[in-house]
Amino acid sequence: RAWINENLMATLTHISQESYTSGSWDHQPDTLGDLKTSRIKDEFTDDEWDQTSLTLEGNIGESSFTYAGTFFDRDVRYLWDYNDYVEYYSLDAVGVNGFGYASYYTCDYYSYYYYGTYDCNNPTMWADYSLSMERDTHELRFSGGVEGDKVQWLIGVFYDKLENPYQYTYKWPGLQDEWSNGSFGGTGIAGREGIWWDADNLRKDETKAVYGEAIISLNENTDLTVGLRAFDSKLTFDAKDGYFGGYGIDYYGHEANRTEKDSGISPKLAISRTLENDALLYFNFSQGYRPAGTNRTNKNSDSAPLYYDSDELNNYEVGYKYSNSDGTQRFNIAGYMMDWKDMQTAVYDRDLATIQFNTNIGDARITGVELDWTIITDNGFFIVLGASLIDPKLEEDFVLNGVVQATSGTQLANVAKQKASIAINKEFSFAGRNAYWDLNLSRTGKRESSITNPVNQPAYTLGSFSSTLEGENWDGTLYIDNISDERAVIWEYQGFRPETKFTNRPREIGIRLKYKL
């Protein structure tokens, strides 16, 4: 950070990170046992990214300005085992008995049919995914006025450009040559041997926006905020994907080019009033949208749509904020309603497609109440209580390909209707040194895994405890994460592997030491 002159300051930041993980967060407790899962191919994720940011802050007369630019690059590769797919279509699928669909492509069918022998290749399959993302954002805003002025204002421009080439390759080295290269009755593609499915896609997003906001003091206790954001976005998809083994040309998938443009004006409105006890009563309205996208589908077999459209959100919130004069109590409560127009969501239903896909499920509404209460007691306890009640549901039937998949009133996926938490902190002295302990408990209510054919995901409670001793230039912490060793069902996979559940970390007890140089 440096002062260029008395009116202009520059801040340059660079962050570089690389992480590598192996294994998976899912397990099969009912069939294999607690924290156990079955894999043939080792799984890993390799994630590397760099971000450079430049911020310029300065003054021009009575107004101030800020420029913020960010340049982001990310390369990711991960590999995951896909043998549950092979097993399902070899042995477990309805109508498959013994010599299954998947075996048909890895075994010599004629040896089995005429001689009763199994001349089979290794059926192991895995998915290899990679992306190389580049994103640049630029924002310039000017503001004027300070708290207490009749009018405070803000205007700005924004630009966002994203380029994201990504590739999914489902590798099946044991695929019989006649199916993968088309040499013997098959319909594969020469040079694509050993590949079951390949998706080579490029997505480009470009967004331009101008915005303005004014805070108008109606009187000494009431402020009115009005704002507008005009945006123009352009999304370009270049999608090439499809089966390369064992199917006709009609099933090779898509070479789809699509350009979608969106533009509009999103309003913002807020009014707040300070009450006699210095509490704040407020109302907010805001509007936003999410851009469209594309799915991985083949031309004929999947019910999943090739494209899904943008959606729009109108958010209404009314709330109350209170803090007493000595800061020992703070209380916030808010009620909100989120109206979604043609809501986007992810659907995983094997009756509709063999992979998860995104689609527009129609209008939806989420209403809720949330509160938090902070208390500092006379004997030094710092306590934070939080809770929320949510009603997330469809406002109309979800219809896909002329068939009702979920009726109006269905609970939205992966949204808990109840949540609660408590955090307690206490400072104390030990051996003449400052110390403190923290206790955190949270409760998450039950959820549904999908909008169609949902699996009930039970409620769970997580807790953690830590105690820290502070030295002059060091800290030592004893901690216990997941005190009760809870196995939360974060999400239950409805795929080919039975009852696969993604869970949290098991109980961990440890010591952390920090030394300040």
Where are the regions a protein language model picked out?
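Acidic/polar loop-and-plug regions of large Gram-negative outer-membrane beta-barrel proteins
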Residues: R1-S53, E87-W126, W172-R203, M343-D349
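Membrane-embedded beta-barrel scaffold of Gram-negative outer-membrane proteins
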Residues: T55-N59, S64-Y82, T274, L280-R290, ...
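Repeated loop/turn-to-beta-strand initiation elements of outer-membrane beta-barrel proteins
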Residues: E6-A10, E62-F65, K150-V151, N221-L224, ...
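Signature of Gram-negative outer-membrane beta-barrel scaffolds
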Residues: Q152-E276, S303, V384-G386, D391-K393, ...
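C-terminal beta-signal and adjacent terminal beta-strands/loops
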Residues: D339, F382, S442-S450, L469-L517
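Transmembrane beta-barrel wall of Gram-negative outer-membrane proteins
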Residues: R1-T21, D47-L54, M133-E134, F142-G148, ...
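Residue-level signature of outer-membrane beta-barrel architecture
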Residues: A2, E57-I60, E134, G144-V146, ...
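Gram-negative outer-membrane beta-barrel transporters
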Residues: S217-L224, M337-D339, T359-I451, K514-K516
